[in-house]
Amino acid sequence: MIACLRLLTAFCLAALLAACASSPSSTLGELPRTPDASIEQLLEKAATAKPEEAALLRLSAADQAARQGDSARAGQILGTVPVDTLKPAQQIFAVTLSAELALTRNDAKAALAALNHPSMSHLAELPVEQQVRTSTVKAKALEADGQTLAAARERIFIAPLLNGAEATTNQEAIWNLVMALPPEQLQATSNDDLGGWLSLALAAKTPGTLQQQQAAIDNWIAQHPNHPAARQLPQQLVTLKNLKNQPLDKIALLLPQQGPLVSVARALREGFMAAQFQAQQSGQKAPAIEIYDSSRITNIDDFYRQAQAAGVQLVVGPLEKNLVKQLSVKAQLPLPTLALNYSDSAQAGPPQLYQFGLAAEDEAHEVARRARADGLHNAAAMVPKGEWGDRVLAAFRQDWEGGGGRIMAVERVDQPVALANQIAEMFQLRGAGNTTGATPTRRQDIDFIFLAATPQLAQQIKPTLNYQYAGEVPVYATSHVYSASGDQAQYNDMAGIRFCETPWLLDTGNALRQQVTKQWPAAAGSLGRLYAMGADAYLLAPRLDQLKALPDNRIQGLSGSLGMSSTQRIERQLPWAQFDGGQVKRLPDTAR
């Protein structure tokens, strides 16, 4: 009876091993796969199996745990497998699984290190399924590590191995990767599939009217008839080609003509109308502009009925936050609307609503991008007390910590008299005791300071940093530190501070800016940001559908480089400058 049981056990083990392996070749070894047995059954059998058989069983058990979402257990089981003693097929399986587990921990570098294994030279000899699995995780790891072009190249490599839904998913991933590349990396140097993808992305990113962009895509297809993307366009381009090229003939400009926002509305209106005048001067067919007074609105639905009856195709405005909130909670709007403010909700509003403003949150994100591009890791933050400072800090924290950075200290500033103590606390400044001539010590783990403050406060902060032995710590600020007043004494007090700012205030040679400041001198100062926003609202008006169809597209405006989020909010990326010798010195743009 015992002999029979042993024989039965042997047969079961053989069947289980057969279910756990496929055999590419005798030299490569058997490739594990997940059988119908449970993890516990696989591990139980592995405990009494021969070493090679046990390794197959444990690899299958680890793979099954990973597929069930138990990454910790998968890693624990995988750790019991002696990878160096395995045959190449099993090694590739093991390092692929190890890379997948590393990505669940958001550790792209560990994933790439795992895949940098000698056995990978045999990958092309394995079944297609394993080639696809290994190359897919490598592409994901490269993308997570910021190696966007290499990730696209890896996905292009496996594209011929795929079909059906997998092929479509991979093709959309390739498109998203090449569209994330900066323009200088889109210059195709070959006629292979990668070169075709790069030139298609360049065509899609080249600014122009809807008609021009559609023609650029058609020209690309004619030049690359056998390219995979010509046979099946990415979904974004399908949407773009299906947009109706309908001219925009009439815009309603909805702004308050009385109340506390009159001066803001005036600057927006003058910037908007100046942009229309410039378009007419350059020979463009400009839409008619009809101005409506939002301060007189008692019923927003009545306004839309009036606008529709007047033949309006697009509403630009309102500016008032309460009216934007009303629009944001509606299911539909009668007309496409570019609001000149943001609702408080982060959720998308009705499909016809777009929101645009000079959000301080955009600038907080810009500081995070810049500091990250400059290779910095640990931040301290100085923001004003109150709701505005809390919002700016929250936006910076979300972006900075989301990208792997750390915030070591936060100070909420208010009164200049308290700055010395606040900065001393932030840097944990310690006195030199009784040692004559010794320099006080401070913490050394702060790479830079994120600053959101008025010019008057900022010009107190930088000298105080110098006094508190922290003058060499870089300061990255929002535009709020810049008064654009030309006050050299103030600029000297802020020497070394880097800040993001609108092109309007930094590029003083811009033709539209020169026209506007000649007529309205106040536009040369801090109020110029609103003139820039008004001009950009005109620029955005005919291109909203394009930005919606191609979220990676950007419009180079005077308030920043403009793109659209998934919630149809216009987001700005800004150029940079630095206070230097009582002047404002333009810095190179942030690498994107």
Protein language model annotation of sequence segments:
Residues L16-D36:
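Bacterial Sec signal peptide processing site at the extreme N-terminus
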Residues R33-V238:
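Alpha-helical protein-protein interaction scaffolds
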Residues Q308-E320, T337-L340, N378-P384, G433-P455, ...:
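Periplasmic-binding protein-like
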Residues I446, K462-A535:
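Extracellular/periplasmic periplasmic-binding protein-like sensory domains
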